[in-house]
């Protein structure tokens, strides 16, 4: 299995969109994977390092941006896509691509399946071909049809929902994908060394060891935000 694309999504919210340029550069130049931004907005994000796919405006933001990543990946047929978050800085090509090279393209991989600590599969780090995404997640050909089906589901997301964030269906993308994938025979869960946030520089504890950066110890960083206010610290990293 060779990863072709890394897909992420955003609307015009600067809290997320501002990460596109630095994150796309990391995916392209450090990891060697083509980054794709599914953009629900009115501007023109840079395509210097990746592909921008303009999506129709949607009343169901931000859930639409979350689910769009699965849906777009499912349209890529024999191409392999890794789903990522736009504020997740990728550092390790071994963790993100090389360790899955041993698997056949008909498998569906998750490289951080922390159900024991997170209660579900995170949207970040699903890896599969378009055929596998479509089959495993029962994706429609039309994005709005696929989103409407997701919205028709009922999940207890009380542990996910945060007042003022998203809506009453926040995290439905993760609950729905998890429900379907746990029944899918070709799912392979590759445990992350150190658990859910192992080998990660996390915004909840923004400290790191420079020698470990140089040695390739860190897989990724869930970045501090917003980017503009923290640009110097993020760019230094």
Task: Kindly give the residue locations of the regions a language model identified.
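Conserved donor-nucleotide/metal-binding helix-loop-beta segment in metal-dependent transferases, i.e.
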Residues: 90-122
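N-terminal anchoring/stem segment of glycosyltransferases
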Residues: 1-58
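Hydrophobic anchor at the start of a short beta-strand
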Residues: 33-35, 81, 187-188
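The conserved acidic donor/metal-binding loop of glycosyltransferases
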Residues: 85-89
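Short glycine- and hydrophobic/aromatic-rich loop-to-beta-strand nucleating segment
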Residues: 119-134
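Catalytic core and acceptor-binding pocket of nucleotide-sugar-dependent glycosyltransferases
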Residues: 131-237
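A structural signal for well-ordered alpha-helical segments within the folded catalytic domains
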Residues: 18-21, 25, 71, 171-179
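A conserved donor-nucleotide-binding helix/loop in the catalytic core
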Residues: 57-82
